[in-house]
């Protein structure tokens, strides 16, 4: 796994293609080779590795075990870029900006492009909840 680095670029509010980074887990004596194409972010690495080790994952963090989580759970990705934060779910992106601004977009992963769409109040609320909860847990020292 890697990080997108300092040169995140693009015309988009959140240039998603610069965040696409593969994760490789190599343990040939313990894990059969396979490719898993699922939405996951760096916050999912620890619970995924713990799941591979057969260990429980109970923590106040937002990551999930990307290999063993129930398929019914909808996966989300959280982003921070410049002064904006965003949440992505099922190719629907909501960008939350300064001054309570927001923008709802549909992401086309093949064309790597966005199309504006009607406000998605549910996804916007979920994004606000994730970021506000994380901020509150951090500010009040409850991340342990």
Residue ranges of each PLM-predicted region?
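Solvent-exposed soluble domains appended to multi-pass membrane proteins
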Residues: 1-144
């Amino acid at each position: 796994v890697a990080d997108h680095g300092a040169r995140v670029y693009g015309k988009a509010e959140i240039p998603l293609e610069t965040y696409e980074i593969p994760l490789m887990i190599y343990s040939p004596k313990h894990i059969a080779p396979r490719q898993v194409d699922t939405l996951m972010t760096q916050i999912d690495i620890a619970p995924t590795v713990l799941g591979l080790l057969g260990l429980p994952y109970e923590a106040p963090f937002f990551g999930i075990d990307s290999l063993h989580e129930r398929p019914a759970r909808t996966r989300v990705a959280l982003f921070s870029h410049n002064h904006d934060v965003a949440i992505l779910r099922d190719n629907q992106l909501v960008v939350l900006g300064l001054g309570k601004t927001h923008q709802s977009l549909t992401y086309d992963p093949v064309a790597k492009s966005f199309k504006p769409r009607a406000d998605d109040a549910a996804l916007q609320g979920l994004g606000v909840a994730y970021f506000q909860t994380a901020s509150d847990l951090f500010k009040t020292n409850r991340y342990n």
